[in-house]
């Protein structure tokens, strides 16, 4: 298994698919990385040379991935909550942030139903 950005990349899959195992790299970004490095997207990781894998590592390093990306997202959410803006309040209360209805649905965000006390 090749190791890129601290993640073990599966050897038996195509390069584009393998790169998506890195948090922050989706299909589109993986295709761009392959295009810039000149690596065949359909080639399997086990068939790539060490030099090609190094090129992939270098190109992936240019993007914000894994722990840095998670930290950045959490800091942005924390900033909203500290500001006390509407979006921050919704995050704090665990409700939908982007204007979805909450009278019905929103069960994933609100959690399991709470019984009515009498």
Curated annotation (Swiss-Prot):
Which residues does the annotated region (Disordered) include? Answer: 93-118
Q: Which Pfam families match?
A: Ribosomal_S13 (PF00416)
UniProt-listed GO biological process terms = translation
Q: Which GO terms describe its molecular function?
A: rRNA binding; structural constituent of ribosome; tRNA binding
UniProt cross-references to InterPro entries, sorted A to Z: Rbsml_uS13_C, Ribosomal_uS13, Ribosomal_uS13-like_H2TH, Ribosomal_uS13_bac-type, Ribosomal_uS13_CS
Q: Which Gene3D superfamilies does UniProt cross-reference here? A: 1.10.8.50, 30s ribosomal protein s13, domain 2
Please provide, in alphabetical order, the Gene Ontology terms of the cellular component aspect for this entry.
cytosol; small ribosomal subunit
Q: Which family does it belong to?
A: Belongs to the universal ribosomal protein uS13 family.
Instruction: Tell me, in a sentence or two, what this protein's role is.
Output: Located at the top of the head of the 30S subunit, it contacts several helices of the 16S rRNA. In the 70S ribosome it contacts the 23S rRNA (bridge B1a) and protein L5 of the 50S subunit (bridge B1b), connecting the 2 subunits; these bridges are implicated in subunit movement. Contacts the tRNAs in the A and P-sites.
This chain's protein is named Small ribosomal subunit protein uS13
Organism lineage: Bacteria, Pseudomonadati, Pseudomonadota, Gammaproteobacteria, Pseudomonadales
